[in-house]
């Protein structure tokens, strides 16, 4: 049950961090450059998107702390790395971001995903029955 909580928390952290990245990108691309702040009124939707993205990062951190409570760091961190793939796919798929797919980006993201799968497959196969630093229930 604790491992399931860890996986759910890590997944929540990954999804929230991905949403935060997309929200920051969308909001910041619609705000004026800092040197123009004095002369322009910022778009409210963009400010709201940035504020929500910061909140999503905070929630992602809380999920991350919960994940670390129940999962080995290598396992949790590899899942968090999958957020790169999710952000890339969404940013290139959604017209609001004006991003594109490319062979080199897709290959790089594919390697990240392959790494996540490799790390988790090896750890599952070689997982010890008892972690030495934890007491048996």
UniProtKB/Swiss-Prot annotation:
Spell out the coiled coil positions from the record.
Answer: none
Pathway field of the UniProt record reads: Bacterial outer membrane biogenesis; lipopolysaccharide biosynthesis
Q: Does the keyword Endoplasmic reticulum apply?
A: no
Q: Tell me where in or outside the cell this protein is found.
A: Cell inner membrane
Residue spans crossing the bilayer: 4-24, 45-65, 77-97, 101-121
Domain of life assignment: Bacteria
Q: Name one GO biological process term.
A: lipopolysaccharide biosynthetic process
Disulfide bond as UniProt keyword: no
An MF annotation (GO) of this entry:
carbohydrate derivative transmembrane transporter activity
Q: So which stretches are on the Cytoplasmic side?
A: 1-3, 66-76, 122-137
Keywords per UniProt = Cell inner membrane, Cell membrane, Lipid A biosynthesis, Lipid biosynthesis, Lipid metabolism, Lipopolysaccharide biosynthesis, Membrane, Transmembrane, Transmembrane helix, Transport
Topology, Periplasmic side = 25-44, 98-100
Task: Report the InterPro entries cross-referenced here.
Answer: Flippase_ArnF, Small_drug/metabolite_transptr
Predominant localisation class: membrane
* A GO CC term assigned to this protein in UniProt: plasma membrane
Matches recorded under HAMAP family:
Flippase_ArnF
NCBIfam families documented for this protein: PRK02971.1-2 (NF002816)
The family assignment reads:
Belongs to the ArnF family.
Q: What does this protein do?
A: Translocates 4-amino-4-deoxy-L-arabinose-phosphoundecaprenol (alpha-L-Ara4N-phosphoundecaprenol) from the cytoplasmic to the periplasmic side of the inner membrane.
State how it assembles: Heterodimer of ArnE and ArnF.
- Name the UniProt record assigns to this protein: Probable 4-amino-4-deoxy-L-arabinose-phosphoundecaprenol flippase subunit ArnF
Please give the organism.
Answer: Pseudomonas aeruginosa (strain UCBPP-PA14)
